[in-house]
Amino acid sequence: MCIRHRSFDGHTAAVDALASGAAAVVTQDRLGLENELRVADSRSAYARLCAALCNHPERKLRMIGVTGTNGKTTVTTLIRNILSDSGTKTLLTGTVCNRLGDENLPSGLTTPKPPELYSLLSRAVSQGCKACVMEASSQALAQGRLEGIDFDAAVFTNITRDHLDYHGTFENYVSAKKKLFEHSALSIVNLDDPRANEIIAASKGKIITFSTVLDCADYTAKNISLLSDCVRFELVSKGHIEHIEFASPGLFSVSNAMAAAVCAVNLGIEPKDAAQSLAKSKSVCGRLERVECSAPYSVIIDYAHTPDGLEQVLRALRPSCRGKLIVLFGCGGDRDKTKRPLMGAAACKYADKIIVTSDNPRSEDPIKIIGDILKGTDKKRRDLFVEPDRRKAIVLALKTAEPGDTVLLAGKGHEKYQLIGGEKLPLDERETVRKILGLPHDTGRKKQ
């Protein structure tokens, strides 16, 4: 397969491939080779070929895709839980892990590449799965990894700036997201998002909307209670009222729970069954995850790595914070640089103490990344600290925290490593916190 990548054009290897024994090459460009099979889009052809070689397992499953800047992991997990609790064995693919029934499998990419994806789907079919819930990333959609899949349902959570290092412009980013809804029988759309109408316009199937504020939506949330450890609300549609509780704070948790419930109900699940499943669902690993410790302050780990994501998490934690709200965060290297000062500004607006550190600097100088973040902050603040070493930054956060404070470790979430230079170094923030506090090793997180 001759695929044009950002740093390498596979067409340049076509002659060598034939010389090495390949029977033919599939190309997007005319190369003038004898055994050349030309296609309009080699990425699309690659995905479709992988599907065919695995005997099209995607046609034997109810395919549900979830896309958006924030909330994908939580929403897919909740949908998977609802379907599983209703007796439908379900494959979950996403950022944190791939889960086949009750078996956790490692996850490399948010959305697997075609060979891995169809191998996983084929395995799911052979083991009796009837549905697949997957996170559909913008890169996967732009690269055509999901070409040829007719989704039974597609869910839109929200869209804010992210991945501009890959897409170039925000409009390109939005356009990539819209692709999911062009091939879905059902579109579940968050009407609270400013770009919702664009998603609706791109949708080819039935459209169902939900909102936390707009009565014109098909499903609305009423009598919302934002508590320190959960949200409660009434899911209202055509006169039917279902009481929902989900163990995660913040208004965005209402939106996530709504997205999952609305999707499940429109796939045939009874509203009361969806509500019961949500009520017993735990927070997802690395998403507003509370570290169990004996400290007189709270320690929260969250994957927030965008300006909007960081703002939403800080706002969610504020009501339950009796003391100072302390945030520790950095920004990824070799990624969208324009969001760095915006992350700094969000932290300054909503946190009482800020510790700027490293995330995954990759090939960039961590000090340069931190400098970009600081451009969005008030450098005169006495409660703004810089510590490039993330472990040392966590020590600083915990050693200076006082009773009643809330410490948010943002950006890493479920990740248990740091990418520094060309190395992947171990860093489990849960264990780091426990070690600093002199606590024993955690034997494992409870099942979600």
Model regions: which residues?
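N-terminal leader/targeting and accessory segments in enzymes
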Residues: M1-R48, A52, P194, T220-S225, ...
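Glycine/threonine-rich flexible loop motifs
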Residues: S7, H11-A13, Q143, L164-E171, ...
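Short, structured coil segments at secondary-structure junctions
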Residues: G21, G32-E34, I149-D150, H183, ...
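Short, polar loop motifs at secondary-structure junctions
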Residues: A22-G32, G94-C97, L191-R195, T212-V213, ...
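Short loop/edge segments at beta-strand edges and connector loops
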Residues: T27-Q28, A40, G94, A136, ...
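Phosphate-binding loop of NTP-binding sites
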Residues: Y46-L191, R195-K206, M258, L267, ...
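Adenine nucleotide phosphate-binding catalytic loops in nucleotide-utilizing enzymes
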Residues: H167-V174, A201-E311
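ATP-dependent carboxylate-amine ligase
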Residues: K204, A259-K272, Q276-Q448
